[in-house]
C-alpha cells in the first residue's frame, strides 16, 4: 500500500468515526494534517501530468503552448 493509499484510508477512518461519535481534538488535528498532505500530493501529481502534457492538432502537429514547452525543457521532459 502506498503512502497516498494509507493517508486516504486514515482520512476515511476518521471521517467514519466523526460521523458515528465525533473526534477528539487530537484526531481532528490529525485529520486536518492528513487532508493538507492529501491535497498537496494531489496537486503535485496533477501538476506533473499537466507539465508532461503534449497537445496535438488534427493533423498530428504539436501545438503545445510555448510556455508549457519551456517548462518541459527545464524538467528534461522534451
Curated annotation (Swiss-Prot):
A Pfam match = DUF896
Matching entries from InterPro entries are given as: DUF896 (IPR009242)
Give the coiled coil ranges: none
Q: Which domain of life is it from?
A: Bacteria
Question: Which keywords annotate this record?
Answer: Cytoplasm
**Known SUPFAM superfamilies for this protein?**
YnzC-like (SSF158221)
Q: Which compartments is it annotated to reside in?
A: Cytoplasm
Q: What is this protein called?
A: UPF0291 protein Ldb1355
Q: Which organism is it from?
A: Lactobacillus delbrueckii subsp. bulgaricus (strain ATCC 11842 / DSM 20081 / BCRC 10696 / JCM 1002 / NBRC 13953 / NCIMB 11778 / NCTC 12712 / WDCM 00102 / Lb 14)
Amino acid at each position: 500500500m502506498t503512502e497516498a493509499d494509507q493517508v486516504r484510508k486514515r482520512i476515511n477512518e476518521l471521517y467514519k468515526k466523526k460521523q458515528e461519535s465525533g473526534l477528539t481534538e487530537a484526531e481532528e488535528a490529525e485529520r486536518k494534517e492528513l487532508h493538507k498532505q492529501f491535497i498537496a500530493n494531489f496537486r503535485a501529481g496533477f501538476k506533473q501530468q499537466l507539465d508532461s502534457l503534449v497537445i496535438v492538432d488534427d493533423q498530428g502537429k504539436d501545438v503545445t503552448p510555448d510556455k508549457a514547452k519551456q517548462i518541459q525543457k527545464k524538467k528534461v521532459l522534451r
